[in-house]
């Protein structure tokens, strides 16, 4: 089993992508977890297969799980339209680039935990092309990291003291000192 994540930003507000992926063999414990997720639907967190179109499932079989509780139809349409297509294309890009061996496409499965900013529902000027491209790149990057075991434990240990979480840096910049 392999695990990876990526953060890709750089577009308009609300278009950043932060997928987390788990990749494993479909005929083992991972496959059991994959099937259980499909069968265990929860309101607001529907799990769906990543598809290229209404009846063209991507390979390796990829299950999308939303990190955000889905509450409205517009958000659902963006998640199950633009982002679903982007994830499917990111998976195929990973096969094309050799991160996932083509001859393993029927044996492996991918679970993608998807972050889609809820603000997209209210963006009247949402650029679906930018949103698509960012989620596609983020999916490919997360899969690449997973399949290449990145970052390595050696790199993490070497850089541990110089890595500062973005959220922490942002909070520190706005912190008021109290004595």
What do these predicted regions represent?
Residues 1-172:
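Accessory interaction regions appended to the cores of large information-processing enzymes
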């Amino acid at each position: 089993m392999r695990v990876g994540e990526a953060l890709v930003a750089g577009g308009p507000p609300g278009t950043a992508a932060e997928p987390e992926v788990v990749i494993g063999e479909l005929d083992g414990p991972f496959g059991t977890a994959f099937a259980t997720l499909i069968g265990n639907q929860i309101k607001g967190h529907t799990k769906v297969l990543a598809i290229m179109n209404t009846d063209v499932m991507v390979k390796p079989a990829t299950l999308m799980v939303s990190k955000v509780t889905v509450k409205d139809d517009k958000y659902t349409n963006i998640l199950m339209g633009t982002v679903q297509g982007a994830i499917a294309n990111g998976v195929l890009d990973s096969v094309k680039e050799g991160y996932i061996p083509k001859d393993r496409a029927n044996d492996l499965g991918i679970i993608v935990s998807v972050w889609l900013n809820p603000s997209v529902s209210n963006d009247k000027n949402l650029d679906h092309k930018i949103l698509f491209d960012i989620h596609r790149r983020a999916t490919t990057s997360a899969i690449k990291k997973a399949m290449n075991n990145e970052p390595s434990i050696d790199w993490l240990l070497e850089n541990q003291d110089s890595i500062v979480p973005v959220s922490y840096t942002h909070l520190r910049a706005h912190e008021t000192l109290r004595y």
